[in-house]
UniProtKB/Swiss-Prot annotation:
CDD domains: GemC1_CC
Keywords, in A-Z order: Cell cycle, Coiled coil, DNA replication, Nucleus, Phosphoprotein
Coiled coil: 83-118
Record's function text: Regulator of DNA replication. Promotes initiation of chromosomal DNA replication by mediating TOPBP1- and CDK2-dependent recruitment of CDC45L onto replication origins.
Protein location: Nucleus
Domain of life: Eukaryota
PANTHER family according to UniProt: GEMININ, GEMININ COILED-COIL DOMAIN-CONTAINING PROTEIN 1
GO biological process: cerebrospinal fluid circulation; cilium assembly; DNA replication; multi-ciliated epithelial cell differentiation; multicellular organism growth; seminiferous tubule development; single fertilization; spermatogenesis
Protein name: Geminin coiled-coil domain-containing protein 1
């Protein structure tokens, strides 16, 4: 059996260098070769016997060809492994969600127990009482009305606070308000004390120290006269000179102050003291005359004027700030 194979086949001897067909036989008994075939062989060169023996062996083993062949089993295994991995991930996610759901159920049960507790019930009862009260309804109603109104209409122009105007109106009210009437003071008392009124001192008019009788009376303890206003003064002189003035008679009398009386004047200096003592008036003497009056200089910037009446003693002195202080000490009966 003769067969003609192309010379371009790479598995034949000579490879692609043989461009002419040749005939070969597959039987072992004999080979029939034509002249054209032999001429072509001699022209191209004789083939080795080894190459002729190897050519049919190569043709007999086509399974050993190095063509790329896809393995279907390996492809299926790869697809299956990816699906298994995805299934594993879904199972893990499902377990996490189940654990979270169980935790939420537990928290929900705790909240229900707390809502059913007595504390929450008491708070609910108190809230109901507050909501049902009239005061809360009034306040809530006002708040709702304020919310319904626009911002520009919530306050009328008259209700808007104006601080400057309010201050000015307040000052006019204070200036226009009527003062409460105080106790009536006789003019002779103000003139004797050298006062224009209860709040103003008149330095231009001298005080009236005259008297109608010439019977002197003993002067009370000086410490009792200054117990309210002269605390804090020191060094009271031990000998106090008193100048008595009467109707046409003048005299001087010296008295000494006890040691315990000096303790009430710890800061009093040692200036000379001039005391004008007026006799005590009797029942037939008009009360417009003073019983006793004297003045003393406690310091260069502080003078105390003392006036004594049958009702008590009056003390007028200037303080450190330049003002005046008036003190009235009634007599003890």
């Amino acid at each position: 059996m003769n067969s003609i194979l192309p010379c371009q086949d790479q598995y034949f001897v000579g490879g692609q260098s043989y461009n002419c067909p040749y005939s070969t036989t597959t039987s072992e008994s004999g080979v029939d070769v034509s002249k054209e075939t032999w001429v072509s062989f001699w022209a191209a060169g004789l083939l080795d016997n080894t190459e002729l023996q190897q050519a049919p062996q190569v043709l007999e083993s086509p399974s050993e060809l190095s063509f790329p062949v896809l393995d279907s089993c390996s492809w299926e295994e790869a697809q299956l492994s990816s699906q298994l991995y995805r299934n594993k991930q879904l199972q893990d996610t499902l377990l996490q969600k189940e654990e979270e759901l169980a935790r939420l159920h537990e928290e929900n049960n705790h909240l229900r127990q707390y809502l059913n507790s007595t504390l929450v019930k008491r708070l609910e009862e108190k809230a109901k009482k507050l909501l049902s009260s009239d005061e809360f309804s009034k306040v809530f109603g006002k708040l709702r009305k304020e919310k319904r109104k626009p911002k520009e209409h919530r306050h009328s122009p008259a209700e808007i606070p104006q601080f400057k105007t309010a201050k000015r109106n307040l000052s006019t009210e204070f200036s226009n308000c009527e003062e409460q009437p105080g106790p009536h003071v006789d003019p002779w008392v103000l003139q004797t004390l050298g006062l224009k009124d209860l709040n103003t001192i008149d330095d231009t008019l001298p005080a009236n120290y005259s008297a109608t009788t010439s019977h002197p009376r003993a002067v009370p303890s000086i410490s009792s006269l200054f117990v309210h206003d002269a605390n804090g003064y020191a060094n009271v002189p031990r000998d106090l000179h008193l100048d008595y003035v009467g109707q046409g008679t003048h005299g001087s009398h010296t008295t000494s102050i006890h040691q315990e009386d000096c303790h009430s004047f710890p800061r009093l200096s040692n200036p000379p003291v001039r005391v004008q003592t007026l006799p005590y008036h009797t029942a037939d003497v008009s009360p417009n005359k003073t019983e006793m009056a004297f003045s003393t200089s406690l310091s260069p910037h502080c003078n105390v004027k003392t006036h004594s009446f049958h009702q008590g003693q009056a003390f007028v002195r200037r303080d450190e700030e330049g003002g005046w202080k008036f003190t009235w000490v009634p007599k003890q009966t």
